[in-house]
């Protein structure tokens, strides 16, 4: 397998860590990564709230609209954009969802900050994000990271400490092997107290940067408690 479609929400810390891993695999094997979108805000929409495309600025959705416009020019621009906003939020604890920060990050990846305004002024960028999102929903998916490999849809792998080098290739073999077994539906590791502590440590930058409540399948996730902040 030489091509993978990788669906992400830029605000998801787990998808970002998985993206770090898949980039390492690409560096070693030369695989092609097609970056695609998925909105956790939309899939977890609370009744009575506006859809993200009904707001002038929606944190993850607007960042993906910018990415959609960049992708029309070149996938490598979206590649750099996701790397930049992911590093800002999930490593530095910054706020790429702040328009001023987003403009700075656009300059950092070598494009004009006015791309932000162009993406928001173009209603078809909504369509691009919606189409990617709906592809996952139609396949029965609910979150990110979601991968498509040779027509197979896989959720995961869910990582907080992405492997590199030979270990990254070992995980790639597991993932591609599972894609070749279409009736294997789930393989999950229980989390020990030590695992929970590791996850909490890795989520601290995300907690510093976020300005929203985390929701999973309609329920609020108390990540602050997990990280020992409440």
Curated annotation (Swiss-Prot):
Protein's UniProt name: Uncharacterized protein MT2344
Q: Look up and give the organism this protein is from.
A: Mycobacterium tuberculosis (strain CDC 1551 / Oshkosh)
Q: Which InterPro entries match?
A: Rv2466c-like, Thioredoxin-like_sf
